[in-house]
Swiss-Prot record:
Intervals, Cytoplasmic compartment: 522-553
Function summary: Class I viral fusion protein. Under the current model, the protein has at least 3 conformational states: pre-fusion native state, pre-hairpin intermediate state, and post-fusion hairpin state. During viral and plasma cell membrane fusion, the heptad repeat (HR) regions assume a trimer-of-hairpins structure, positioning the fusion peptide in close proximity to the C-terminal region of the ectodomain. The formation of this structure appears to drive apposition and subsequent fusion of viral and plasma cell membranes.
Annotated coiled-coil segments of the chain: 142-170, 466-491
Post-translational modification: The inactive precursor F0 is glycosylated and proteolytically cleaved into F1 and F2 to be functionally active. The cleavage is mediated by cellular proteases during the transport and maturation of the polypeptide.
Organism, scientific name: Newcastle disease virus (strain Chicken/Northern Ireland/Ulster/67) (NDV)
Similarity comment: family membership: Belongs to the paramyxoviruses fusion glycoprotein family.
Phosphoprotein as UniProt keyword: no
Disulfide bond residue pairs: 76-199, 338-347, 362-370, 394-399
Taxon lineage: Viruses, Riboviria, Orthornavirae, Negarnaviricota, Haploviricotina
UniProt name for this protein: Fusion glycoprotein F0
Signal peptide limits: 1-31
Encoding gene per record: F
BP terms from Gene Ontology: fusion of virus membrane with host plasma membrane; symbiont entry into host cell
Record Pfam families: Fusion_gly
Length: 553
């Protein structure tokens, strides 16, 4: 029952994992396609699996520091074992005393518990200030007090065994594994061999191995000298103490081989000393490791930007450093709550931010929607390697091909150059020689140009320059306004009074009416004159016809 409860995933974590898994099943995802983005100076450098975790699982390792020798070889190894025992006691007694002081500082009474805890931490660690990590370590130590007491109750049987690793379950609230790195050595060298060894050789072998282990112990507990019992032990330190037997505990706690290397690199597996018994030379360590929920189909995609050439100078794309994609939705991923390893992200919570339509369109492959910020710095990265090939800004640096010999030129208006083994086998960039082995296939877009409208100002110096230009424009406008005001001041104010304006309006209306009447009268006179002309013309024609008729008669 104890081991089962120690490995249970908390309800909030289970709910988060189930919701995320349900979403991932509905919306299968693929990693962001970086092929259309590379020529625009946006490089997809890799993906990592996203996991959510909580540090909820604990188990105990009981390190058996003093090995049991075979009966027929005890006399030969007596001298080095006694010296080793004395050194162990000298080295670890301060640690044991500190553990006991902290555990005994908390009584069963209710009042002032936190104050006594802080006081014990400061007194035990000989520090002026108790850090949050030390308080956490001391709290874990106090919570493990009962388990440590149960282990001490079994110390005689643990010390008497000749097994290098075995599980201890009697009366313990959590999984405990007793391991003995030195016992493993004794078993391998003396108990499982039929070869007869002389006493001198036994003494030498035991002495050398014990000295090596003492060196490892000193390395592991070096930080404990300045802050006894309050410094966490790393997974590497735990392996030094327990040897390969550490895997037994991790396997029992549910850590698979496929997760082990990634978890070791994350630093999430830690240990805290909870007991030291100088009589039996037993060292108890409580191991804390995370409960991990794998979010299927959720991956973090890492983006890097390259300085590209534009008509406004060199510029870098404005895109998030890390994005995650589920289905057709792409959002920025906040990794401040995550611990990174080579292949995984372990996050206590998943926090994403929506992106603007422009950035979303850009990362979807529409490079004309990408926005860029001017980067005039001489140290801005002008090239980047990608899958055995190189993406370089050959206007910012000289791209020299050594095989075949020549200079790789970048076309006018082209943002960057995509260089692979088809165009160059050996490339030299700023004195760095690279042998290319990859190829950019036809799916990679090339010859992308950045328009002026895509380059904006974001840097502090550039913004200051633009503000200066705006201030100059405002000053010029103020000068024009002042000139206009001076001209207005010359205008007679009396002529612009209300009564004068009314008079001007009335006179204007009268003038317009008179003009219209004059126009109508002129039109009437013209019409009347034309009518008279037509009448006279008709009379003349009629008289002429009568005269012609009379002449004929």
């Amino acid at each position: 029952m104890g081991s089962r409860s120690s490995t249970r995933i908390p309800v909030p974590l289970m709910l988060t994992v189930r919701v995320a898994l349900a979403l991932s099943c509905v919306c299968p995802t693929s990693s962001l396609d970086g092929r259309p983005l590379a020529a625009a100076g946006i490089v997809v450098t890799g993906d990592k699996a996203v996991n959510i975790y909580t540090s909820s699982q604990t188990g105990s390792i009981i390190v058996k520091l003093l090995p049991n020798m075979p009966k027929d070889k005890e006399a030969c190894a007596k001298a080095p074992l006694e010296a080793y025992n004395r050194t162990l006691t000298t080295l670890l007694t301060p640690l044991g005393d500190s553990i006991r002081r902290i555990q005994e500082s908390v009584t069963t009474s209710g009042g002032g518990k936190q104050g006594r805890l802080i006081g014990a931490i400061i007194g035990g660690a000989a520090l002026g200030v108790a850090t949050a990590a030390q308080i956490t370590a001391a709290s874990a130590l106090i919570l493990a007090n009962q388990n440590a007491a149960n282990i001490l109750r079994l110390k005689e049987s643990i010390a008497a065994t000749n097994e290098a690793v075995h599980e201890v379950t009697d009366g313990l609230s959590q999984l405990a594994v007793a391991v003995g790195k030195m016992q493993q050595f004794v078993n391998d060298q003396f108990n499982k061999t039929a070869q007869e060894l002389d006493c001198i050789k036994i003494t030498q072998q035991v002495g050398v191995e014990l000295n090596l282990y003492l060196t490892e112990l000193t390395t592991v507990f070096g930080p404990q000298i300045t802050s006894p019992a309050l410094t966490q032990l790393t997974i590497q330190a735990l392996y030094n103490l327990a040897g390969g037997n550490m895997d037994y505990l991790l396997t029992k706690l549910g850590v698979g081989n496929n997760q082990l290397s990634s978890l070791i690199g994350s630093g999430l597996i830690t240990g805290n000393p909870i007991l030291y018994d100088s009589q039996t030379q037993l060292l108890g360590i409580q191991v804390t490791l995370p409960s991990v929920g794998n979010l299927n189909n959720m991956r973090a995609t890492y983006l890097e930007t390259l300085s590209v050439s534009t008509t406004k100078g060199f510029a870098s794309a404005l895109v998030p450093k890390v994005v995650t994609q589920v289905g057709s939705v792409i959002e920025e991923l906040d990794t401040s709550y995550c611990i990174e390893t080579d292949l995984d992200l372990y996050c206590t919570r998943i926090v994403t931010f929506p992106m603007s339509p422009g950035i979303y369109s850009c990362l979807s492959g529409n490079t004309s929607a990408c926005m860029y910020s001017k980067t005039e710095g001489a140290l801005t990265t002008p090239y980047m390697t990608l899958k055995g090939s190189v993406i370089a800004n050959c206007k910012m640096t000289t791209c020299r091909s050594a095989d075949p010999p020549g200079i790789i030129s970048q076309n006018y208006g082209e943002a960057v150059s995509l260089i692979d083994r088809q165009s160059c086998n050996v490339l030299s960039l700023d004195g760095i020689t690279l042998r290319l082995s990859g190829e950019f296939d036809a799916t990679y877009q090339k010859n992308i140009s950045i328009q002026d409208s895509q380059v904006i100002v974001t840097g502090n110096l550039d913004i200051s320059t633009e503000l200066g230009n705006v201030n100059n424009s405002i000053s010029n406008a103020l000068d024009k306004l002042e000139e206009s005001n001076s001209k207005l001041d010359k205008v007679n104010v009396k002529l612009t009074s209300t009564s004068a304006l009314i008079t001007y309006i009335v006179l204007t209306v009268i003038s317009l009416v008179c003009g219209i009447l004059s126009l109508v009268l002129a039109c009437y006179l013209m019409y009347k004159q034309k009518a008279q002309q037509k009448t006279l013309l008709w009379l003349g024609n009629n008289t002429l016809d009568q005269m012609r008729a009379t002449t004929k008669m």
